[in-house]
Regions:
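Alpha-helical transmembrane segments and their membrane-interface exit regions
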Residues: 21-27, 45-50, 73-82, 147-152, ...
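Alpha-helical transmembrane segments of multi-pass integral membrane proteins
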Residues: 70-86, 98-126, 142-153
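Membrane-helix interface "capping/anchor" motifs
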Residues: 26-40, 155-167
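Hydrophobic, ordered structural segments
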Residues: 43-99
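Helix-coil boundary and interhelical linker segments in multi-pass alpha-helical membrane proteins
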Residues: 50-66, 127-134, 183-193
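C-terminal transmembrane-bundle signature of multipass membrane proteins
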Residues: 155-231
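Membrane-embedded alpha-helical segments in integral membrane proteins
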Residues: 1-2, 46-55, 117-126
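Structural signature of hydrophobic alpha-helical transmembrane segments
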Residues: 2-19, 67-76, 133-146
Length: 231
């Protein structure tokens, strides 16, 4: 049945809740360096894609097409890339991944990509939302920020860099604002509230993830130094 029909609203609430639960498991496993995070990630991003699509076609408010494209066409395939990369760095269902850190040059490049990417994404999303009048749109800016940060965060995560957690903290802060705005703008905001709760938990978990991965990256750095000395 069509998602716009009244009877579909309850289904979408349950559907979003299942995705939120999978996302919680996904982020907890990720924070602990467990490769099974990508299994639950597939479930999470698939459901999040449907939720973002449905939210974007709701009457009234600003669409979140960037969020939809991010999940459907980037996050989903990157789950498989991440699984492959983590396996290369020693992760399995029992062993944690060997984490690493960015060099100063790589960190500067990441910041530059973020700033330029956000500007480009904002104007592309404004153009794509043909029903939106000219002018500044805070929701679209948040959508662009979340889009670019998620792209960077997923790359850093797949390559097992500790700095991913700085990115995820920003992602979750902006996501809370994004979905809070959707909840206030939409006539039926039941499942958007679920998304606000979901990203609020993600924010707390990302802070814990930074703590854990800081230690994992120190251990990974020591192991790399030892391997170089042995070789």
């Amino acid at each position: 049945y069509k998602l716009q029909q009244p009877g579909a609203r309850q289904f979408m609430l349950i559907f979003a809740s299942v995705g939120a639960l999978a996302g919680v498991v996904n982020t907890v496993l990720s924070a602990n360096g467990n490769i099974l995070t990508f299994l639950f990630g597939v479930i999470d991003v698939t459901i999040a894609s449907v939720v973002a699509f449905d939210s974007s076609i709701q009457p009234g408010g600003d669409p979140v097409w960037g969020n939809f494209a991010l999940h459907a066409f980037y996050f989903l395939p990157m789950q498989f890339v991440g699984w492959w990369q983590w396996r290369k760095r020693g992760a399995d269902s029992k062993a944690k991944v060997r984490a690493r850190r960015l060099t100063r040059g790589s960190a500067a490049l990441t910041v530059g990509v973020f700033l330029s990417g956000t500007a480009v994404a904002y104007y592309v999303l404004c153009w794509f939302g043909s029903d939106i009048s000219d002018g500044f749109h805070a929701i679209i800016l948040f959508d662009a920020l979340v889009f670019v940060l998620n792209v960077l965060g997923q790359i850093l995560m797949s390559l097992a860099y500790m700095e991913q957690w700085y990115v995820w903290i920003l992602v979750n802060v902006f996501s809370v604002f994004l979905w809070s705005g959707k909840a206030m703008a939409s006539a039926d905001s039941s499942y958007t509230v679920v998304m606000v709760i979901k990203y609020s938990f993600y924010l707390l978990n990302s802070i814990n993830g930074l703590r854990i991965w800081w230690k994992l990256s120190q251990k990974g750095h020591r192991e790399s130094d030892l391997e170089e000395k042995v070789s």
